[in-house]
Regions:
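Conserved small-residue
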Residues: 1-87, 306
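N-terminal leader/targeting segments
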Residues: 3-4, 195, 262-263
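Histidine (H) residue identity feature
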Residues: 9-15, 50, 56-57, 89, ...
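Generic hydrophobic, helix-prone segments enriched in Leu/Val/Ile
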Residues: 20-25, 176, 249-251, 297
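Short, flexible helical or helix-coil boundary motifs
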Residues: 29-30, 53, 57-64, 68, ...
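Basic, glycine-/proline-tolerant helical and adjacent loop/strand elements
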Residues: 63-223
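Intrinsically disordered, low-complexity regulatory regions
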Residues: 211-368
Length: 368
């Protein structure tokens, strides 16, 4: 008999980050899953993921993880006295979640623990208020995120229409405790690249992590741009206009408020102009940018300064002529604004053939 499976579809960024965090734990613990536009997991992966999240924190992040009592990430998600009940009974029951037509989830199709199992859970519950415990699993509230309460409750519209009144299901309430694992540390805060496609989300965040191994100081614009470029080169797939428009970076920042003298957590959003996204996701354009392999040229494209590519090529041709005549190229030469390998004759010769083609393809792509 084949094992039952759960299909997870993209939703708001907090939910998507929870799914990606779950996948990181499953991958680390060598538990299989399917990922395309949606994610498919075996029901048994739920219990394995709960055991796995503690292992992941200990072995990968080198820190202890907790969801009970006054922990730093999900304060009072459960009480300390409920720890054994949650692990041995509640998470086990989560493996049997099913769609319930009588209950609503605002984020997914709605996966709830069946009523007959809830009755059994109540008998095992270590406390008096079982209905209160379950109510916490069916409503989006402060236990579901760490240190972001003020940011979300004060400006709910900036949180993709998330608010405290919306109902969520037992599975979504569980997935949220994985969301912090999806965020990547940068010099500008922790980031998560979100999109309406789980494979795209998974790939872009992987590429972002790889990019940051080269330099932790890259700004968010460059991290996103480089991730899109890598995706275009490695996947060679076309994305629809709607998908492109909905690629964004969620940024978690800590800001010191001089008035209250407290450090506050805020949520910010970043995306690239649509033309830039369209350009970077074009395989032929991305390949030419990769072949040039010059950050200064990439920065011009990210900034939308396409006409400067013509200017850059003019200085490349002048530099080639100087090198042919064995003339010295000074550090103040205009070409140094565009290239670091400005003394490499063969490189400049190659680039002189690429830049005009790149410029024309960019103009074609954006319809100029």
């Amino acid at each position: 008999m084949s094992e039952e499976k759960i299909t997870l579809y993209p939703s708001n960024w907090l939910y998507n980050a929870g799914v990606v965090g779950l996948l990181k734990v499953l991958e680390y613990n060598k538990i299989g899953f399917e990922i395309n536009e949606q994610v498919i997991i075996n029901n048994s992966a739920i219990k394995a993921s709960y055991e796995g999240i503690f292992q992941y924190h200990k072995e990968v992040l080198k820190e202890n993880f907790s969801i009970w009592g006054k922990n730093k990430r999900y304060p009072n998600y459960i009480q300390s006295t409920q720890k054994e009940f949650f692990k041995n009974h509640y998470v086990k029951a989560l493996q049997s979640v099913e769609k319930n037509g009588n209950k609503k989830c605002s984020w997914c199709e709605g996966y709830f623990i069946p009523f007959n199992l809830l009755e059994k859970l109540e008998r095992k519950f270590s406390g008096k208020d079982f209905s209160g415990f379950m109510e916490q699993r069916e409503k989006f509230q402060g236990i579901h995120f760490a240190g972001l309460g003020a940011a979300i409750t004060e400006v709910p519209n900036s949180f993709w229409n998330l608010n405290f009144s919306i109902p969520i299901c037992h599975l979504c309430s569980y997935l949220i405790i994985f969301n912090h694992l999806a965020f990547i540390k940068t010099s500008e805060g922790e980031i998560f690249i979100n999109a309406p496609d789980f494979k795209l989300i998974w790939d872009l965040n992987r590429f972002a992590e790889n990019i940051l191994t080269k330099s932790k100081e890259y700004e968010i614009r460059k991290i996103l741009g480089s991730s899109l470029l890598q995706w275009a080169i490695k996947r060679r797939a076309l994305l629809g206009a709607w998908t492109m428009m909905n690629i964004e970076v969620i940024v978690k920042k800590k800001i010191f408020d001089p008035k209250t003298k407290k450090t506050e957590n805020i949520i910010d959003y970043f995306d690239l102009p649509q033309d830039i996204t369209k350009i970077l996701l074009d395989y032929e354009i991305a390949s030419l940018i990769e072949e040039i392999n010059e950050e200064k040229i990439f920065d011009l494209i990210l900034s939308g300064k396409f006409s400067e590519l013509e200017k850059a090529n003019y200085f490349v041709l002048k530099a080639i002529l100087k090198l042919k005549n064995k003339e010295e190229i000074s550090k103040n030469d205009p070409i140094t604004k565009y290239f670091t390998k400005y003394k490499d004759f063969n490189y400049l010769k190659k680039v002189s053939g690429i830049l005009p083609e790149l410029y024309l393809k960019i103009l074609e792509k954006i319809g100029r």
